[in-house]
Amino acid sequence: MNAAISATARYLPEGVLSNLDLERMLDTNDEWIRSRTGISERRILRDPKKATSYMCGEVASQLLRKRGLAAEELELIIVATMTPDMMFPSTACLVQDIIGAKNAWAFDINAACSGFLYALNTASQFIKAGTHKNVMVIGGDKMSSIIDYTDRSTAILFGDGAGGVILEAAESEGFGVLDARMYSDGTNGKDHLLMKGGGSLHPATHDTVDQHLHYIYQDGRMVFKSAVTSMADVAAEIMERNGLTSDDVSWLVPHQANQRIISATAERMGIDESKVISNVGRYGNTTAGTIPICLSELDDGGHLEHGSNLVLVSFGAGYTWGGVYVKWQ
């Protein structure tokens, strides 16, 4: 039996970093930011004692309440993140502790902005195989912890947030996660979107800190071109493999990198913007959090009906990208 989404949830911190705030910090302005990214503000987790696990823990608690599950009923927790609280233990283990899911095993997946789709695809296999009944999948990042707020090319893009889902066996055939295609390209991707510092190649030293190696670096032009092409191509592949036309697609749920990428992807797919969810203007790019946050907003807003066809697409560092076809039950 296919895996189906039985609950959704999201967490966005209360702190807001607006374009006007960035005007006071950087050589930029609101009009320039909005025209190039579509972003007006982003959420920031300002409490230095709280990190990615806190946001993911909030999502996990909501998911349990919404689905009416006890924490002990969870069998697996997968967290997609590129900003773990620490190198180890995994953020998923920290979330397990936060909610008291003592019977679940837990691990992280790091595929940057594609992380949630990688995790969703991975988790669905355990349901489909019949070895697990209740699996929690969360995507979240505290991007403000790795942003250089003197670099306007990246500081304007990213925000903090998390979202997640619970997966269970679909109630009937033909619903749930019906197809997925995942890709990676380390050859062309490794130099254009990365954080050099903090790993075994460049462990923390005075030099790595002075050189700003512990902040995200992005070649915006290269990433833009690759993101649009890759997301549109994998979406087209998903649609072709499953006999879907643009009219059949109820919602395109794209990674919220920036509005230009979202619009260009939808245009290449021939999907009307009225069927494309976009919240990047309010939250910025929350990396692994974008797609589950979108799903939660659609769900809470009553926009997902029985039989709705969702095409989820993402692109991230690596390069990594992928698409998932979900028929809502």
UniProtKB/Swiss-Prot annotation:
Enzyme class: transferase
SUPFAM superfamilies hit by this protein: Thiolase-like
EC number: 2.3.1.180
Gene3D superfamilies per UniProt: 3.40.47.10
UniProt GO BP: fatty acid biosynthetic process; secondary metabolite biosynthetic process
Residue span of region ACP-binding: 256-260
InterPro entries on file: ACP_syn_III_C, ACP_syn_III_N, FabH, Thiolase-like
UniProt keyword annotation of Acyltransferase present: yes
Organism domain of life: Bacteria
UniProt subcellular location: Cytoplasm
Pathway it works in: Lipid metabolism; fatty acid biosynthesis
Gene Ontology molecular function, alphabetical: 3-oxoacyl-[acyl-carrier-protein] synthase activity; beta-ketoacyl-acyl-carrier-protein synthase III activity
Active-site residues, as the UniProt record annotates them: C113, H255, N285
Catalysed reaction, written as an equation: malonyl-[ACP] + acetyl-CoA + H(+) = 3-oxobutanoyl-[ACP] + CO2 + CoA
Keywords annotated in UniProt: Acyltransferase, Cytoplasm, Fatty acid biosynthesis, Fatty acid metabolism, Lipid biosynthesis, Lipid metabolism, Multifunctional enzyme, Transferase
GO cellular component: cytoplasm
Function: Catalyzes the condensation reaction of fatty acid synthesis by the addition to an acyl acceptor of two carbons from malonyl-ACP. Catalyzes the first condensation reaction which initiates fatty acid synthesis and may therefore play a role in governing the total rate of fatty acid production. Possesses both acetoacetyl-ACP synthase and acetyl transacylase activities. Its substrate specificity determines the biosynthesis of branched-chain and/or straight-chain of fatty acids.
Family note: Belongs to the thiolase-like superfamily. FabH family.
Entry note about domains: The last Arg residue of the ACP-binding site is essential for the weak association between ACP/AcpP and FabH.
Record's subunit section: Homodimer.
Protein name: Beta-ketoacyl-[acyl-carrier-protein] synthase III
Lineage: Bacteria, Pseudomonadati, Chlorobiota, Chlorobiia, Chlorobiales
Gene name linked to the record: fabH
